[in-house]
């Protein structure tokens, strides 16, 4: 796995985008096969669970070596007209354990859509506190649920 280099030939190139309005990469891609995914291409298409839960190879990114990214829950109980999450992921449900995401690292950026709306999410937050992991709840926290 490596970042795409237009000077190289590849067996397979994966391209993804979140939004339909994101412009496509309109240049020649030197690959035998090109796989496009993400909600920007097809809201119905999903990855096999064993692929979706793979953790990134952090060594190819220029980030803090003690940092990890992930989701503890997927889905959302709200049905905001403008949001694709309930349609794509369904109701909120457990997804991964914090220790699977961090794998010994002490910092995490969590991208859950509504972690406080789930008992599992609350249990994971208690575990995060117990393990002393510093967390950035990147998508925010629903203030209506913090009481």
For each feature predicted by the language model, list its residue ranges:
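Core AdoMet radical
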Residues: 14-18, 85-147
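Short catalytic/ligand-binding loop motif for oxyanion handling, primarily in non-cytosolic enzymes
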Residues: 22-24, 42-46, 78-82, 89-91, ...
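N-terminal pre-triad scaffold of radical SAM enzymes
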Residues: 58-89, 105-112
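Glycine-rich beta-alpha loop elements in corrinoid/cobalamin-binding modules
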Residues: 1-69
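Glycine-centered flexibility motif
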Residues: 35-40, 44-47, 75, 132-136, ...
């Amino acid at each position: 796995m490596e970042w795409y280099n237009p000077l190289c030939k590849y067996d397979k190139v994966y391209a993804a985008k979140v939004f339909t309005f994101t412009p496509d990469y309109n240049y020649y891609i030197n690959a035998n096969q090109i796989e496009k995914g993400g909600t920007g291409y097809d809201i119905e298409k999903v990855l096999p669970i064993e692929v979706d839960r793979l953790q990134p190879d952090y060594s190819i990114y220029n980030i803090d070596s003690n940092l990890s990214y992930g989701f503890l829950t997927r889905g959302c109980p709200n049905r905001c007209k403008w949001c694709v999450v309930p349609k794509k992921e369904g109701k909120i449900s457990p997804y991964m354990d914090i220790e699977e995401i961090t794998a010994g690292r002490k910092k995490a950026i969590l991208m859950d859509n509504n972690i406080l709306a789930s008992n599992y999410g609350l249990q994971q937050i208690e575990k995060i506190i117990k393990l002393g992991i510093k967390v950035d709840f990147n998508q925010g926290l629903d203030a209506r649920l913090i009481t």
